[in-house]
């Protein structure tokens, strides 16, 4: 069976993701589609709107065959570390190809860019340092250095191009046999908050509408019915969807009661930002106003969000430095095709395949996952909090036997 990997967050799963799945299947002739998905906290430092279990159900209902979890230590990171963890997991599961969405839509541009980067890495790094010294944020310094290095370069001001470039580099750096492919993103950009297309909108815009109105019917045209069902069921069960404001009291407590020395141990805390965090948190009444007051050219909104997640989960620089590569494959869900594929390859897997998280106790990567889950589920009152914690440790992988969306 030919296995093709995709790297996803599904926050939530929408029609643009559906398009990506269909195009991936058509382009690659995949027999088995494997998604490596971020858990409860995401790459841009945000809590997922619903849990990884609800998002796994969305993915399986849409036709993904296997869903595995990208551990927290890779999921809540800048593009390079995020990509490194994700492609290593897909390789460990035997994926022959990786297909990602991008603004470019041209894999040749990514391959040429990666070749240029490897040939001129020292010059590129020097250009980045120069831009950082001028006060630019890392994403802008990266994009400007790339523009100076190659005038016909891939546009690295576009977020999905940045991720795609990181995937291709990670495949090359790790000397993996995975063949990268890309398809163009449809209509809405990653950060687009408008509804300019009749059926395609970004996850950012969908979350904004849900946060402001709480009305699922306002986004019904942009998501599959199975996504709507999962969102509705989650709110009925747990009384809410997740956003940063739910965690702001906990963050404020952590920052007020941590010393500057404590904060300097946390991953991402550099260049004296700990003083600014403690200064700005005192008068901040919402997460949004806190980040707006704290951000600088160097410390962007996204970088601060990731840092704040690490503060909540007490994820240290030491732990980050030790997290060199995934140590397990955690299975979140599968359908019959996925079950047959795993049966076929299970003796050849490069990492242990884990169905029940209890077997991972003591693994450093999973110990961090437990802390992330304890934070994520703290948005619930008791007894829901304890029930959600138990779900993390006791839930078996979801087996989906229903029909795909037509």
UniProtKB/Swiss-Prot annotation:
<feature type="binding site">
    <location>
        <position position="160"/>
    </location>
    <ligand>
        <name>ATP</name>
    </ligand>
</feature>
<dbReference type="GO" id="GO:0016879">
    <property type="term" value="F:ligase activity, forming carbon-nitrogen bonds"/>
</dbReference>
<comment type="similarity">
    <text>Belongs to the TmcAL family.</text>
</comment>
<dbReference type="Pfam" id="PF05636">
    <property type="entry name" value="HIGH_NTase1"/>
</dbReference>
<keyword id="KW-0067">ATP-binding</keyword>
<keyword id="KW-0820">tRNA-binding</keyword>
<keyword id="KW-0436">Ligase</keyword>
<comment type="function">
    <text>Catalyzes the formation of N(4)-acetylcytidine (ac(4)C) at the wobble position of elongator tRNA(Met), using acetate and ATP as substrates. First activates an acetate ion to form acetyladenylate (Ac-AMP) and then transfers the acetyl group to tRNA to form ac(4)C34.</text>
</comment>
<dbReference type="GO" id="GO:0000049">
    <property type="term" value="F:tRNA binding"/>
</dbReference>
<keyword id="KW-0694">RNA-binding</keyword>
<dbReference type="InterPro" id="IPR008513">
    <property type="entry name" value="tRNA(Met)_cyd_acetate_ligase"/>
</dbReference>
<protein>
    <recommendedName>
        <fullName>tRNA(Met) cytidine acetate ligase</fullName>
        <ecNumber>6.3.4.-</ecNumber>
    </recommendedName>
</protein>
<feature type="binding site">
    <location>
        <position position="101"/>
    </location>
    <ligand>
        <name>ATP</name>
    </ligand>
</feature>
<feature type="binding site">
    <location>
        <position position="185"/>
    </location>
    <ligand>
        <name>ATP</name>
    </ligand>
</feature>
<dbReference type="GO" id="GO:0006400">
    <property type="term" value="P:tRNA modification"/>
</dbReference>
<keyword id="KW-0963">Cytoplasm</keyword>
<feature type="binding site">
    <location>
        <begin position="7"/>
        <end position="20"/>
    </location>
    <ligand>
        <name>ATP</name>
    </ligand>
</feature>
<keyword id="KW-0547">Nucleotide-binding</keyword>
<dbReference type="InterPro" id="IPR014729">
    <property type="entry name" value="Rossmann-like_a/b/a_fold"/>
</dbReference>
<keyword id="KW-0819">tRNA processing</keyword>
<dbReference type="GO" id="GO:0005524">
    <property type="term" value="F:ATP binding"/>
</dbReference>
<dbReference type="GO" id="GO:0005737">
    <property type="term" value="C:cytoplasm"/>
</dbReference>
């Amino acid at each position: 069976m030919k296995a093709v990997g995709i790297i996803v967050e599904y926050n939530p799963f929408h029609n643009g993701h559906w398009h990506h799945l269909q195009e991936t299947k058509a382009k690659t002739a995949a027999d088995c589609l494997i998604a490596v998905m971020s858990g409860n906290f995401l790459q841009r430092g945000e809590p997922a709107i619903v849990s990884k279990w609800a998002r796994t159900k969305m993915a399986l209902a849409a036709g993904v065959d296997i869903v595995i979890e990208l551990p927290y230590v890779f999921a809540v990171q800048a593009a390079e570390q995020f990509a490194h963890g994700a492609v290593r997991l897909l390789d460990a599961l035997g994926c022959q190809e990786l297909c990602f969405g991008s603004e470019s839509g041209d894999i040749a541009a990514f391959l040429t860019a990666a070749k240029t980067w490897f040939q001129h890495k020292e010059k590129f790094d020097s250009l980045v340092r120069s831009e950082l010294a001028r006060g630019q944020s890392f994403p802008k310094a990266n994009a400007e250095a790339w523009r100076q290095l190659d005038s016909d370069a891939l546009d690295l001001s576009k977020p999905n191009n940045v991720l795609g470039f990181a995937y291709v580099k990670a495949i090359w750096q790790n000397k993996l046999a995975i063949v990268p492919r890309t398809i163009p993103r449809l209509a809405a950009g990653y950060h687009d908050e408008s509804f300019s297309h009749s059926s395609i909108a970004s996850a950012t815009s969908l979350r904004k509408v849900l946060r402001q109105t709480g009305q699922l019917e306002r986004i019904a045209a942009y998501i599959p019915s199975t996504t709507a069902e999962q969102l509705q069921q989650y709110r009925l069960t747990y009384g809410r969807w997740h956003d940063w404001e739910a965690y702001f009291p906990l963050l404020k407590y952590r920052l007020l009661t941590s010393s500057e020395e404590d904060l300097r141990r946390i991953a991402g805390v550099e260049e004296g930002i700990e003083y600014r965090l403690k200064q700005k948190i005192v008068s901040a009444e919402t997460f949004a106003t806190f980040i707006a007051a704290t951000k600088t050219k160097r410390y962007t909104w996204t970088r601060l969000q990731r840092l704040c997640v690490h503060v909540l989960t007490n994820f240290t620089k030491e732990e980050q430095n030790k997290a060199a590569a995934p140590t397990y494959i955690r299975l979140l869900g599968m359908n019959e095709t996925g079950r047959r594929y795993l049966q076929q390859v299970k003796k050849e897997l490069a990492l242990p395949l884990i169905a029940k998280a209890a077997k991972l106790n003591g693994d450093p990567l999973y110990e961090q996952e437990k802390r992330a889950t304890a934070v994520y589920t703290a948005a619930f009152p008791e007894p829901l909090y304890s029930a959600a914690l138990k779900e993390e440790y006791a839930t078996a992988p979801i087996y989906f036997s229903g029909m795909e969306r037509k």
